[in-house]
């Protein structure tokens, strides 16, 4: 099919050089030369978070995968570095949250273009000739086999082998999947076009070479693809020793490129034949013909040998031994990096940056000129003939230098909430990071780290950014007023739980239903048990009878004082009396109305409450019940700051364990934050915490590598390299996220507006917040606060929500 002489004397268009003919099965392309190809999209392990031992283990498993293939196969391993998605758009209901997000958008775009890397493995197989298959059938007689066309057998064999390869990749990589028809055509189109777009497979997917080409290729010493100049760098020399991810520094570059490593494996006999030829040639070069003649004439052994030839022969012999033992396979490897740009000088600068990285790792390379078009064609998936480099390479060296790993950028969308990521962050490289709280339908998260490392700032930012989701509500249990400013800026309500606060509860308001009665009884029994009253069946009956009588009263009379008047037992009356208006706690628990606001953002200050061990359990038990009634399927974030307060009490620990197991069904994400990892590891519910919170964010901790703390980090599944990253991170700037999808060290990159709202936890800030709140009221708090912090431009913008595209303007 490659012979075009019937139509034209020589190839005249880009389509003539392409091999892709048609789609014959899902994701499988039949090429013009009869070969089959299939592409796997994968995401390799994160080298930044891997220990040397883990890297060696991954290399060994990749070597096992690569050594499965023999003659007739071609492997194209590609890292496609592309521009990252733009900053996500959202519809905001809160001016302060909108302004913070616009500030973050401006900072994100100011840092220049961001890039991320997609990795692909294209497997190409050339079936044996039909006459070979016919000869095989002469020696194999299987009456159970129905006669079938050779091409169906070849297709079935190809599908089986590629599926096995995909399964092996899925075992050692976070993600590995076959491309479907549309994704395959989109990928092939991106290789030969300057325009990135989605390509839909036609109903009759034939003539793919003509279908996919929309950009002309101009040859010459400096070829052009459309209006963009192509620059190709080919590796032609290798260092003496390798290591896993030896070229991973290419993943840090701030421009787009295609890095393609093509491997043409050889069968064992063919590889042995080639290596034997190498060894014989080098062995013969150890001594010249003159030295042989001198040795014969003088009968004395030659003393001068070509040491380099001797070493090369020994190297070839060692390669033969590795091949014979089945440790490795050999093949021909071609590695090329392709960059393109409309400005030829920019393309030249980019290829020089690539060359500096490659030469810095001990490789030699050449910037293609005469061979540029041939080298570019050799990078196209399925092309096994163009630009073949002759030196043999074993599969371990291939695993070291191929693009088998990439920085994890995070998912582009929160699929569970059907929206954008929670927040965009940056890292040391040009690859951005997208934080998504959900793993499947589980949005629980743990935030762990020492005091003063930026925990409260992160929690406040999470609350602000979570408001990007439609119908989102945020409930915060705070300590020290850290989230007070963010809550008020969102138009929420901040409560100080305690006797001096402005919040009062009416626990028996909902006695009109059976559920309300049962809940009230459980609350009262917990109260009397705390007062050292033994809960017997008689006590339960007495409480139930009193509650039934109280339920018949008007709603405003369903108070704790009313319950005490209806209880017949003097012991129960004495136990309940401290919580009525006649006792010290009545102002908080014996109200005739419930003053808890119905807003979407509520914050409860726990500092004063938790100092009273007698008051905290009944107050929090009732408050938890009130909040659970609001968990109605809307996206909800429940933030528990300083969570050791909850772990310290059996009732709270049990409630937290139940929440982690059940609230995901109500679309609630529990964010559990604490300063001490030991509090969690020593808690009775530690297994539930670790299992139910798949996403964990660790704060910078310079003492993380100390033996006592290292053991605690290891209990959370961190390895030595990850602990080292946490120890080297900068407090209040760097955060390390760990989740099943990947790991990443990221920087929130907060601007002055975000810092004004999120970093306002000092006593001076609390005093200023109270003064501004008293002067401007809740509705005017956000602009007044920004004015007080000297951000006059931001205060002016906060009233123009939706009218300007970017806060920086």
Ranges and model annotations:
Residues 453-506:
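Walker A/P-loop NTP-binding active-site region of P-loop NTPases
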Residues 1-409:
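Extended, folded cores of ATP/NTP-driven motor/assembly subunits in large transport
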Residues 45, 52-68, 273, 277, ...:
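P-loop NTPase motor domains
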Residues 492-495, 685-699:
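A short helix-turn-beta junction within AAA+ P-loop NTPase domains corresponding to the substrate/partner-engaging
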Residues 716-772:
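Conserved P-loop NTPase
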Residues 439, 451:
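The conserved Walker
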Residues 447:
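Hydrophobic anchor at the beta1->P-loop junction of P-loop NTPases
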């Amino acid at each position: 099919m490659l012979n075009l002489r019937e139509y034209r004397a020589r190839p005249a268009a880009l389509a003539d050089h392409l091999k892709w003919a048609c789609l014959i099965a899902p994701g499988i392309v039949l090429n013009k030369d009869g070969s089959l190809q299939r592409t796997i999209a994968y995401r390799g392990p994160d080298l930044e978070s891997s220990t040397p031992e883990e890297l060696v283990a991954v290399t060994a498993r990749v070597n096992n995968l690569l050594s499965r293939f023999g003659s007739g196969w071609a492997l194209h391993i590609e890292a496609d570095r592309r521009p990252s998605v733009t900053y996500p758009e959202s519809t905001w209901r809160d001016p302060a949250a909108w302004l913070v997000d616009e500030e973050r958008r401006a900072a994100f775009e100011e840092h220049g273009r961001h890039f991320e890397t997609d990795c692909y493995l294209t497997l190409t197989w050339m079936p044996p000739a039909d006459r070979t298959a016919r000869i095989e059938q002469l020696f194999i007689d299987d009456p159970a086999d129905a006669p079938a066309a050779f091409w169906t057998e070849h297709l079935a064999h190809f599908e089986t082998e590629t599926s096995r390869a995909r399964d092996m990749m899925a075992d050692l990589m976070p993600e590995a999947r076959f491309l479907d028809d549309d994704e395959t055509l989109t990928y092939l189109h991106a290789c030969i076009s300057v325009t990135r777009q989605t390509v839909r497979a036609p109903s009759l997917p034939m003539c793919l070479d003509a279908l996919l080409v929309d950009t002309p290729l101009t040859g010459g010493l400096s070829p052009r693809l459309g209006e963009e100049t192509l620059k190709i760098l080919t590796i032609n020399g290798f260092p003496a020793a390798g290591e896993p991810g030896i070229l991973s520094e290419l993943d840090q570059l701030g421009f787009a490129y295609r890095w393609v490593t093509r491997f043409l494996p050889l069968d064992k006999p063919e590889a042995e034949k080639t290596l034997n030829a190498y060894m014989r040639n080098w062995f013969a070069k150890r001594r010249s013909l003159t030295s042989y003649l001198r040795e014969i004439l003088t009968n004395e052994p030659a003393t001068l040998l070509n040491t380099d030839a001797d070493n090369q022969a020994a190297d070839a012999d060692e390669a033969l031994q590795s091949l014979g033992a089945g440790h490795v396979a050999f093949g021909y490897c071609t590695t090329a990096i392709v960059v393109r740009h409309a400005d030829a000088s920019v393309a030249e600068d980019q290829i020089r940056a690539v060359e500096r990285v490659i030469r810095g790792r001990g490789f030699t390379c050449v910037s293609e000129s005469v061979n540029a078009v041939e080298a570019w064609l050799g990078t196209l998936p399925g092309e096994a003939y163009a630009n073949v480099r002759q030196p043999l390479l074993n599969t371990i060296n291939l695993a070291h230098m191929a693009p088998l790993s990439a920085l994890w950028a995070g998912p582009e969308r929160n699929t569970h909430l059907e929206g954008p990521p929670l927040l965009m962050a940056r890292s040391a490289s040009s690859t951005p990071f997208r934080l998504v709280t959900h793993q499947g339908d589980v949005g629980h998260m743990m935030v762990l780290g020492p005091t003063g490392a930026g925990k409260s700032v992160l929690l406040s930012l999470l609350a602000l950014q979570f408001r990007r989701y439609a119908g989102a509500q945020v409930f915060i249990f705070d300590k020290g007023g850290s989230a007070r400013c963010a809550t008020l800026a969102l138009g929420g309500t901040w409560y100080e739980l305690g006797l001096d606060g402005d919040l009062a509860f009416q626990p028996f308001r909902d006695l009109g239903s059976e559920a309300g009665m049962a809940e009230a009884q459980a609350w009262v029994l917990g109260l009397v048990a705390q007062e050292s009253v033994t809960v017997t069946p008689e006590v339960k009956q007495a409480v139930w009878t009193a509650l039934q009588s109280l339920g018949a009263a008007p709603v405003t009379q369903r108070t704790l004082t009313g319950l005490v008047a209806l209880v017949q037992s003097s012991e129960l009356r004495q136990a309940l009396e401290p919580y009525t208006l006649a006792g010290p706690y009545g102002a908080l628990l014996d109200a005739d109305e419930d003053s808890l606001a119905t807003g979407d953002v509520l914050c409860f200050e726990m500092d004063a409450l938790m100092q009273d061990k007698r008051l905290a359990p009944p107050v929090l038990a009732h408050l938890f019940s009130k909040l659970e009634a609001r968990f109605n399927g809307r996206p909800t974030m429940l933030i528990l700051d300083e969570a050791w307060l909850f772990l310290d009490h059996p009732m709270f620990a049990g409630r937290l364990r139940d929440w982690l197991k059940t609230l995901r069904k109500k679309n609630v994400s529990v964010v559990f934050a604490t300063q001490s990892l030991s509090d969690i590891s020593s808690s009775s519910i530690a297994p539930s915490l670790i299992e139910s919170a798949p996403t964990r964010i660790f704060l910078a901790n310079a003492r993380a590598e100390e033996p006592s703390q290292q053991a605690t980090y290891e209990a959370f599944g961190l390895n030595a390299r990850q602990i080292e990253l946490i120890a080297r991170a900068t407090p209040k700037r760097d955060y390390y996220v760990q989740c099943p999808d990947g790991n990443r060290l990221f920087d929130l990159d907060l601007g002055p507006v975000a810092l004004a709202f999120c970093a306002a936890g000092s006593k001076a800030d609390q005093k200023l917040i109270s003064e501004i709140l008293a002067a401007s009221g809740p509705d005017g708090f956000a602009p007044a606060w920004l004015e007080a912090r000297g951000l006059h431009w931001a205060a002016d913008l906060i009233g123009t929500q939706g009218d300007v595209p970017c806060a920086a303007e």
